[in-house]
Amino acid sequence: MTSSLSRPSGRRADELRKVALTRHYTKHAEGSVLVEFGDTKVICTASVAERVPEFLRDRGQGWLTAEYGMLPRATHTRSDREAARGKQTGRTQEIQRLIGRALRAVFDLEALGPRTIHIDCDVIQADGGTRTASITGAFVAAHDAVSKLIAAGKLARSPITDHVAAISVGVYEGVPLLDLDYAEDSRCDTDMNVVMTGAGGFVEVQGTAEGVPFSRAEMNALLDLAQSGIGQLVQLQKDVLGAGHV
């Protein structure tokens, strides 16, 4: 896709920000990744607990769940910690449920066995796309946690069935764009988050017209952009994981 539009970032309409996935970023978690989408930076950890929630007791399967949060000064102005306020915001609950759903879509929970993988995504710097960056990085952290279970003889095979990644797209000044940063996201006419598997299946599509309703043609263009971008992210996941991955 080409366009005469000048994006605030200077990127092409179909160009991702610079994306980096740094594995083994923290010492203690079974899996940990620093994921960077431009100036958005998120630490994703995967921790294993040899137990399942009460609703899964004696069901012979495992579980994967996620939590999401932002450091107080991850954004332009400081926000109080949610723990200090005594409750999570609706946005936080929505995002962490999305992360959990996205990863469970590529897990065989019976093959995981009666254990839980806890995903924690902590935004240390936000410049748009924190939820999509979290999903993309959390997959790699979860993969590394599973690899440790296999190496320890606790799993005979990987319960991971495919890759999963996510990206934001939107209509900005009438032009469909891939991977919105904050300057674009805060001014776009349409904002959409797309989660897909490596095989090309859709896990979730969240799309909202911020002002001007979008057409079917614009929606199709956004989904095409998202599919292309997610394909690049899945390839990056494969590159950083190396041989022997899913």
UniProtKB/Swiss-Prot annotation:
Its EC number is 2.7.7.56. Keywords: Nucleotidyltransferase, RNA-binding, rRNA processing, Transferase, tRNA processing, tRNA-binding. InterPro entries: ExoRNase_PH_dom1 (IPR001247), ExoRNase_PH_dom2 (IPR015847), ExoRNase_PH_dom2_sf (IPR036345), PNPase/RNase_PH_dom_sf (IPR027408), Ribosomal_Su5_D2-typ_SF (IPR020568), RNase_PH (IPR050080), RNase_PH_bac-type (IPR002381), RNase_PH_CS (IPR018336). Pfam families: RNase_PH, RNase_PH_C. One of its GO terms (molecular function) is 3'-5'-RNA exonuclease activity. It catalyses: tRNA(n+1) + phosphate = tRNA(n) + a ribonucleoside 5'-diphosphate. Disulfide bonds: none annotated. Gene3D superfamilies: GHMP Kinase, N-terminal domain (3.30.230.70). Phosphate binds at residues 91, 129-131. SUPFAM superfamilies: Ribonuclease PH domain 2-like, Ribosomal protein S5 domain 2-like. It comes from the Bacteria. One of its GO terms (biological process) is rRNA catabolic process. Phosphorolytic 3'-5' exoribonuclease that plays an important role in tRNA 3'-end maturation. Removes nucleotide residues following the 3'-CCA terminus of tRNAs; can also add nucleotides to the ends of RNA molecules by using nucleoside diphosphates as substrates, but this may not be physiologically important. Probably plays a role in initiation of 16S rRNA degradation (leading to ribosome degradation) during starvation. Belongs to the RNase PH family. Homohexameric ring arranged as a trimer of dimers. PANTHER family: EXOSOME COMPLEX COMPONENT, EXOSOME COMPLEX COMPONENT RRP41. NCBIfam families: RNasePH. This is Ribonuclease PH. It comes from Burkholderia ambifaria (strain MC40-6). The gene is rph.
